[in-house]
Swiss-Prot record:
A GO CC term attached to the entry: cytoplasm
Keyword Signal: no
Source species taxonomy: Bacteria, Pseudomonadati, Pseudomonadota, Betaproteobacteria, Burkholderiales
Gene3D superfamilies in the record: 3.10.50.40, Trigger factor ribosome-binding domain (3.30.70.1050), Trigger factor, C-terminal domain (1.10.3120.10)
Organism: Burkholderia vietnamiensis (strain G4 / LMG 22486)
Name assigned to this protein: Trigger factor
Length: 448
């Protein structure tokens, strides 16, 4: 007898599943007999409980398990016979009208959509390019110097020509202060501290606080009003005005290391050669620029593909991906040390738009890969692993680390497939190259 597949909408379908009662009952009896061999009841030795008593206690549970198994098996058989590409999990409901000799259920489900990808020649992609020169290398060296800054107390000799211990604090100095804050003459939690250090101009403190500390000399104090922002993290003081008194305890001026052989050695250049140091920095910047460029271009290609593609997206797949994103968010919170992160009440609805885009892209990419043979080849995967490993001290160990775990390899395979898609689309789309600075590239990739 042919199975009737009802069309309930663009992707929603329904079929009726019929299970002969005698077949179901035979399976129930068989499972109860198997269960009776190990079941325990007061007054009986294990395996000696009368079958009738076992059936009375467990028949309902066993029947539910058998029906669940049989329904799943029958649905799988029907979907194979009718060539149904089922998306997500079906839902099963008993039919209102039941035959005397069979159980009847309705299985409602969604199918994968037909994906229509438009003419790739109409897709438009802007490809960023960047060059790494002396300016980018010098800027990176400046950042590295600032990361290695150390401080000298006022009165010590140094590049500041600091004028001695009575010099006033200025931006860039590390200051150590005592402060007392009150709201309506009442001290509040977190409003008092001793020997509190911070660097002027870094923005760690509220603007009024930094302004008050600027220009103070050691031993001097200043009283000022400070209004906490309405969205301040301390809810007890948010939006309120406090009166602070800050006393300068210590002022230290910053000293950045010179770019010399010792500095080069601190960056891993064993012989301290400055030319080698600059060459290595350039290589690292070029690698980073390539990574960022690829990320930006990939996002543009994906956006272009979505614009020229037509498909309906199965709700079941969107809901599954929403839950996946919720779990990822909880894992992220756990890694940040948030208590009870695994039970955090994160609404799946907040990921609805992101999940729909991810699912839609996945369907489009799958169709494009299948139609154009863009699957990842083993040699491509190995080449990407080798490239990734180059940035580590022991590349061979990184390669072994990748190939020792199938999940990590699968992630790299997915990356290669995406790269194949990007190259394929770029070869057919309208591509405009745009030269951008490394800073602009970094900013754009951070926002992508």
């Amino acid at each position: 007898m042919a199975n009737v597949v009802e069309n309930l909408g663009k992707l929603e379908r329904r079929v009726t599943i019929s299970l002969p009662k005698d077949t179901v009952q035979k399976e129930i009896d068989a499972r109860i007999q198997k269960l009776a061999k190990n079941v325990r009841m007061p007054g009986f030795r294990p395996g000696k409980v009368p079958l009738k008593m076992v059936a009375q206690q467990y028949a309902g549970q066993v029947e539910a398990e058998v029906l669940s198994d049989k329904i799943g098996q029958e649905f799988f058989t029907i979907s194979r016979a009718e060539n149904l590409r089922v998306a997500g999990q079906p839902s099963f409901e008993p039919k209102q009208e039941q035959a005397e000799d069979a159980y009847a259920f309705d299985a409602t489900f969604e199918v994968y959509p037909e994906v229509k990808i438009g003419d790739l020649a109409t897709a438009e992609v802007e490809r960023s390019t960047t060059s790494i020169g002396d300016a980018e290398i010098d800027r990176t060296l400046d950042i590295l110097r600032k990361q290695r800054v150390h401080y000298h107390a006022r009165g010590e000799a140094g590049e500041h020509g600091d004028g001695g211990a009575d010099t006033a604090a200025k931006n860039g100095d590390r200051v150590t202060v005592d402060f007392v804050g009150k709201i309506d003459d009442v001290a509040f939690q977190g409003g008092t501290a001793e020997d509190f250090p911070f660097v002027l101009g870094e923005g760690r403190m509220l603007p009024e606080f930094e302004t008050a500390a600027l220009g103070l000399k050691v031993g001097e104090a200043r009283t000022f009003d400070l209004k906490f922002p309405d969205d301040y993290h301390g809810k007890d003081v948010a939006g309120k005005t406090a009166q602070f008194t800050v006393t300068m305890k210590k002022i230290e001026w910053p000293h950045m290391p010179e770019i010399d052989a010792e500095f080069a050695k601190s960056l891993g250049i064993e012989d301290g050669d400055l030319t080698k140091m600059r060459a290595e920095i350039k290589e690292n910047l070029e690698r980073e620029a390539k990574r960022r460029t690829q990320s930006i271009v990939k996002n543009q290609v994906m956006d272009a593909l979505l614009k020229i593609s037509e498909l309906d997206v199965p709700k079941a797949l969107i809901e599954q991906d929403q839950q996946r994103l919720v779990e990822m968010a909880r894992q992220d919170l756990a890694q940040r040390g948030v208590p009870n992160a695994k039970d955090a009440p994160i609404p799946a609805e907040m990921f609805a738009e992101q999940a729909e885009r991810r699912v839609k892209l996945g369907l489009v990419l799958a169709e494009l890969v299948k139609a154009n043979g863009l699957e990842a080849k083993p040699e491509q995967i190995r080449a990407e692993v080798d490239e990734f490993a180059k940035s580590y001290e022991d590349p061979k160990e990184v390669v072994r680390w990748y190939y020792s775990n199938q999940q990590r390899l699968a992630e790299m395979e997915a990356f290669v497939v995406e790269s194949n898609v990007v190259e394929f689309v770029l070869g057919k789309a309208k591509v405009t190259d745009k030269e951008v600075s490394f800073e602009a590239l970094a900013s754009a990739s951070a926002q992508a």
